[in-house]
Amino acid sequence: ALTFHYLCSTNYKLRTVMETLEKIFAAKLLKVKAIKLQPTNPFTWASGWKSPFYCDNRKTLSYPELRNFVKIEIGRLIAERFPEADAIAGVATGAIPQGALVADLLNLPFVYVRSKPKDHGLENLIEGELRPGMKVVVVEDLISTGGSSLKAVEAIRNNGCEVSGMVAAYTYGFDVAAQAFKAANVKLITLTNYEAVVAEAVRIGYIDPSDVEVLNEWRKDPAHWNG
């Protein structure tokens, strides 16, 4: 196995490492049923969207080996891509545990960003201490449209800090998210993605190759897909 220290100190070709990581993590997510694919029996998301695809990265917290894998790989990516980082910020609530684990690994300060300020006490939006001028890397568990993730970025910037980038466990790869991150000038890196998960699901026989067309049609226009 490639260790955190080894990957950070060698001249491995980054693209090869990332492609391998995407496949490995996709397989791990499918194994623990953190990702479910139901082309003929779609889920309903909180947004009201119908979807044949559901990802729950919080399940990884219940498996020590997988939890450690996520911590090490996100930590490695931050150490490689954002060595200037002064602090780690987790997006509430899904990325709070992952972000805290990564911050501990890298020996960096940790904060988390709420979706809205508390309605009592200090009414904080950011919990923890960030000093103006700090360079912050945001940790997220999942990227769909990118809206909530980029609100966290905005809150950190409004605190006088610089957001170096964001590392997420998974992305659906929606065009709307790519456009939003580009407009906000935020570099996004993920452990795995839609393409890697679907390819692995077909390889292990979790879905039929014929299901891929349904999944791809949904991904093109998720807001209007009805199954």
Task: Describe each model-derived feature in a short phrase.
Residues 5-143, 147-227:
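PRPP-associated nucleotide enzymes
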